[in-house]
Amino acid sequence: MDWLYRKTLGSIGSCSIETFPWPFYSFFQRIYISTPPGKPENSPETSATEVGEQRPSCLSASPVVEEEECEHRPEKNPTRQWPLDSGQGLTKGLKEKKLTPKRLQLLLVGKTGSGKSATGNSILGRQAFESKISARPVTTTFQKGTREFEGKELEVIDTPDIFSPQNQPEATAKKICDLLASPGPHAVLLVIQVGRYTAEDQAVARCLQEIFGNTILAYTILVFTRKEDLAEGSLEEYIQENNNKSLDVLDVACERRHCGFNNKAQGDEQEAQLKKLMEEVELILWENEGHCYTMEFPNVPSKTL
């Protein structure tokens, strides 16, 4: 356990722990607090559509994973192997059989020009969302596309430029509550272009936390576009050697969940990078026993709840 603590803190140099977002502390609380002292750890393709019609509220008191919407699957270790001293898994208290959603909702967020819509197209394996190089936002409404992947239905939600700091968090929260499909995302894909982590990207991450709450980062995966620009280097090397403390802090807050996308890739390469992304999604599901993120917007008027 000390190995994980030292390795994580060591990766961010002299940055003080007080600068970390709340999920960073939550991450270590799950490791340390959950273990008593002295004890060992134990569909056919559809076209993209605007999500503008009235939906059931995403704020529901009912369980986020319904029995009839899930399949039972034997418990297994997550894809990522954590080198814990006990040799056992990171998340504790999972049942031998757990609920695994048959439909997974992935929410794409990112600044204008990050490659967000192109990433959605890569995930879907077709041109479902309009994507082009532009200084102005191309996506102006919530859109979704679906595909089947390894027996699951993936629902990919592409978002307009609502995470800009110019927008009011309360108004943005209401839009999401009214328009986003119930019950909530199983994973948030924060799209960042390789070599271009700017103040705008940081603002998107902050706005994401303001809207959803700090715990949203426990469901967030960093997706780096233009992976092809890394040439012979790996994504891991890029993150470790970029000398951008803000990016490293965000990566730690997201528990080092990240992957790279070449949105020009086709065929086997395209499917391989989707598989890597889904391994990260599976890890989130494993840690949360199959539950999606329960969205709570305290600043939204009660009539929308």
Curated annotation (Swiss-Prot):
Residues 262-264 are annotated as: G5. The keyword GTP-binding applies. Pfam families: AIG1. GO terms for cellular component: cytosol. Residues 110-117 are annotated as: G1. InterPro entries: G_AIG1, GIMA/IAN/Toc, P-loop_NTPase. Keywords: Cytoplasm, GTP-binding, Nucleotide-binding. GO terms for molecular function: GTP binding. It is found in: Cytoplasm, Cytosol. Residues 225-228 are annotated as: G4. Residues 101-302 form the AIG1-type G domain. Residues 37-91 are annotated as: Disordered. PROSITE patterns: G_AIG1. Expressed in thymus (in thymocytes), spleen (in splenocytes), lymph node and lung. Residues 158-161 are annotated as: G3. The keyword S-adenosyl-L-methionine does not apply. This is GTPase IMAP family member 6. The gene is Gimap6.
